[in-house]
Amino acid sequence: MSRRNGSVMNLDWLKQFIAILIPFAATLAIGAYVHYYTISETERVTWESSELLNVGLARSALNRDLSNVISDLIFLSSYIERQGFGEDGELRAHQVEQLSYTFIKEKRLYDQVRFLDLEGHERVRVNFASGQPQLVSPDQLQDKSKRYYFMETMALNPGEIYISPLDLNIEEGKIERPIKSVMRFAVPIYNNLGLKKGILVLNYLGDRLLSDFNRAAANI
C-alpha cells in the first residue's frame, strides 16, 4: 500500500514539475527570441542609419562641389559683363581671353572656359591641359550652334543658370579621345547696354565630381 501511495506521490510530483517546467521553458524560449530579435533589429537599424549617413554625406559633398562651380560661374560671368565689352557694346575678345586664362589658371578645376556668340560660334576658348591653361587660336575655334547646351542656355532669362547632364565631351563633331566626361555650366552674357551677346560655358570634369563623391562615401 505504501508503495502504491509512493507511486502516486511520485506521479503527482512529476505532473507538478512538468506543469512548472513547460511555462518556464516557454518563457525562456520567448525571452531568447526577443533578445535575438532585439539584437538583430538593432544591428539592422544601425546598418541602415550608417548607410543613410553615408549617402547623406556623399550627397552633401556633391552639392558642395556643384555650389562652388555655380559660384565661380556667377563670378566670372559678372566680371566679363563688366569688363569684357567696349563702350560700343561689342565684345573685347582679348580682354575676355585674359580674364578666362587667369580664372582657369587659378582655379585648376575646369577643363574649358568658353564664350560663344549669338550664333553659337566660339569666340574665346581656354583649355586646361597638363596642368597649364592654353589659349585656343581663332582658327581652332568651333561652331557649337547645334549643341543642346547652347540652345538651352540661349533660351534662359537673366539670372538663370543651365546645368547639363554628365556626358561625353565632343570635339569637331566627334567624341573626344581619350574619353572625357563633363558637366557644362552656362549662363547668358549681357553687354554694358543690356543686350544679350552670347553665353559663358564652364566645362567641369565628371571624373573630378565622381571622385569627390566616392571619396566622401569611402572615408566615412
Task: State what each model feature region is.
Residues 1-10, 50, 87, 155-167, ...:
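N-terminal sensory and localization modules of signal-transduction and trafficking proteins
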Residues 13-16, 24-89, 105-109, 181-182:
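Juxtamembrane extracytoplasmic/periplasmic/luminal helical "stalk" adjacent to the first N-terminal
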Residues 52, 70, 97-100, 147-150, ...:
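Extracytoplasmic/secreted envelope proteins and their assembly/folding machinery
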Residues 63, 67-97, 118-135, 219:
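Extracellular/periplasmic ligand-binding regions of membrane signal-transduction receptors
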Residues 69-74, 104-129, 144, 155-162, ...:
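Short N-terminal helix-loop-first-beta-strand/juxtamembrane motif that initiates sensory/input modules
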Residues 93-107, 139, 171-172, 193-195, ...:
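Solvent-exposed, extracytoplasmic
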Residues 127-203:
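Extracytoplasmic/periplasmic ligand-binding sensor regions of membrane-associated signaling proteins
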